[in-house]
Amino acid sequence: MTNTRKTHPLMKIVNHSFIDLPAPSNISAWWNFGSLLGLCLAMQILTGLFLAMHYTSDTMTAFSSVTHICRDVNYGWLIRYMHANGASMFFICLFLHVGRGLYYGSYTYFETWNIGVILLFAVMATAFMGYVLPWGQMSFWGATVITNLLSAIPYIGTILVEWIWGGFSVDKATLTRFFAFHFILPFIVAALVMVHLLFLHETGSNNPSGLISDSDKIPFHPYFTIKDILGALLLILTLMILVLFTPDLLGDPDNYTPANPLNTPPHIKPEWYFLFAYAILRSIPNKLGGVLALIFSILILMFFPLLHMSKQRSMMFRPLSQCLFWILVADLLTLTWIGGQPVEHPFIIIGQLASILYFSIILLMIPTISLIENKLLKW
């Protein structure tokens, strides 16, 4: 008798995606982050749903409704901090997932990669709008500063900003629409994830060597399901340590002050996971130039397949490219640090140098080194 999981119309899809899926036998722990991102998304949707049951998207009551969740709702504090720190875990997994893709040349799967970059943009938009909802000082001023950047667009900029605001400043209309978008976007992200997986399963997974692994495949279950469960347990452990011991470690103290349009905080900065892009934005003195650099700092990921000059797919056997990759990682950490610092000497010049280095490594150095490595192969 044929197994139900192989014949049932719905079970069949699950079976081909998570059970009988042929996976390369040598994929390392770096391939765990896809499933961890799925776990993060599910957790964020679930905790977000429970928060939305008690939250009010009104400027007069938003801040106090978050306080009410933390003080009066059963385990409200836990749900709130799981949601806030869950976003941080989400971005840690995202950055590691993207980094893995860059290191092992997974970007040669064009469709999967480009959908992934669109997903990154969608998650960043979701996180930004979520940060505005508690209506603290940093929520309000973060929303004001970031939305105001659109006014740099020639001719239609000012009209566009006022249209997004729903008035002449960030106010009730802005908060309400941000809440609506913050609620709907994760479901759009979930739909895009399905498309991401659809394209991935057309080609099959990449592996650390970057070689075709059709001759050496093993079933996803039980080998990689058990491996993913281990990753999930470590993720939950890290998250719960963060939530239960230092829930405000990654937050901003200014957000415990209710939003006040008449009082600007001394240092306006976004959450830590946006600091690298914020540093690139601030490093350019021109407003429009800064906005373009900000967008391009993420959009540049889409150009990686075009910039791939090496005869080898993965960086596993390319020590020179490996050096550049880790310099790029160090550069991104430097940008993250600079994004959280005030705009004064020596941080300005460090930020500018780190921004130049970021684009130089990706656009010039990696392709050049790849060509040199191709030459070295002939020796």
UniProtKB/Swiss-Prot annotation:
Keyword presence, Transport: yes
Xref: SUPFAM superfamilies: a domain/subunit of cytochrome bc1 complex (Ubiquinol-cytochrome c reductase), Transmembrane di-heme cytochromes
Molecular function terms, GO-annotated: metal ion binding; ubiquinol-cytochrome-c reductase activity
Gene Ontology BP terms: mitochondrial electron transport, ubiquinol to cytochrome c
Topology class, membrane: Multi-pass membrane protein
Comment on bound cofactor: Binds 2 heme b groups non-covalently.
Residues that coordinate or bind a ubiquinone: H201
Residues that, per the record, bind heme b b562: H83, H182
Keywords of this entry: Electron transport, Heme, Iron, Membrane, Metal-binding, Mitochondrion, Mitochondrion inner membrane, Respiratory chain, Transmembrane, Transmembrane helix, Transport, Ubiquinone
Locations listed in the record: Mitochondrion inner membrane
Cofactor: heme b
UniProt xrefs under PROSITE patterns: CYTB_CTER (PS51003), CYTB_NTER (PS51002)
Gene Ontology cellular component annotations, sorted alphabetically: mitochondrial inner membrane; respiratory chain complex III
Source taxon at top rank: Eukaryota
Transmembrane stretches, start-end: 33-53, 77-98, 113-133, 178-198, 226-246, 288-308, 320-340, 347-367
Gene3D superfamilies: Cytochrome Bc1 Complex, Chain C
Stated family: Belongs to the cytochrome b family.
Miscellaneous: Heme 1 (or BL or b562) is low-potential and absorbs at about 562 nm, and heme 2 (or BH or b566) is high-potential and absorbs at about 566 nm.
Subunit structure: The cytochrome bc1 complex contains 11 subunits: 3 respiratory subunits (MT-CYB, CYC1 and UQCRFS1), 2 core proteins (UQCRC1 and UQCRC2) and 6 low-molecular weight proteins (UQCRH/QCR6, UQCRB/QCR7, UQCRQ/QCR8, UQCR10/QCR9, UQCR11/QCR10 and a cleavage product of UQCRFS1). This cytochrome bc1 complex then forms a dimer.
Name of protein: Cytochrome b
UniProt source species: Notocitellus annulatus (Ring-tailed ground squirrel)
